[in-house]
């Protein structure tokens, strides 16, 4: 019985790992760099926005552009607005930082609203105004990227 349970757990973990590997990560730098940085971020976090504004350019110049390090950005939403924004960012992810940089640089323009519906409308309007061609509802309702 224990053997069956262990095998079942192993299969489940393998399946989850395979599914996680299918998600395209937002990655910058030399893939073979010895230094790997994984940044867990929330798109509504003001400190994360400050990192992208002040720290990331220096990190990129000194470590990423020189091939010394690589960085992977992972979503760690702290609220429902960040969760939906991260779903949209992941849904449209082409592996670069364009949408993340825009969301962080303009955080105060879209992180508004007294309800999730209002926050979603603000996010959708912002992305459209910025020229991101996104099927917003499809991304928000995509269960595979949750």
PLM features: what roles do these ranges have?
Residues 77-146:
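Cysteine-centric redox/oxidoreductase cores and disulfide-bonded domains
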């Amino acid at each position: 019985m224990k053997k069956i349970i262990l095998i079942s757990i192993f299969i489940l973990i393998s399946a989850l790992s395979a599914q996680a590997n299918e998600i395209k990560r937002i990655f910058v730098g030399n893939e073979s760099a010895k230094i790997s940085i994984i940044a867990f971020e929330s798109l509504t976090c003001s400190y994360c926005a400050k990192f992208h504004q002040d720290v990331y350019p220096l990190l990129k110049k000194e470590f990423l552009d020189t091939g010394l390090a690589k960085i992977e950005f992972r979503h760690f939403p702290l609220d429902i607005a960040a969760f939906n924004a991260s779903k949209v960012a992941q849904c449209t992810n082409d592996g670069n930082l364009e949408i993340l940089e825009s969301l962080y640089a303009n955080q105060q323009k879209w992180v508004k609203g007294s309800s999730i519906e209002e926050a979603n409308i603000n996010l959708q309007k912002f992305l459209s105004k910025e020229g991101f061609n996104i099927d917003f509802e499809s991304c928000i309702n995509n269960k595979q990227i949750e």
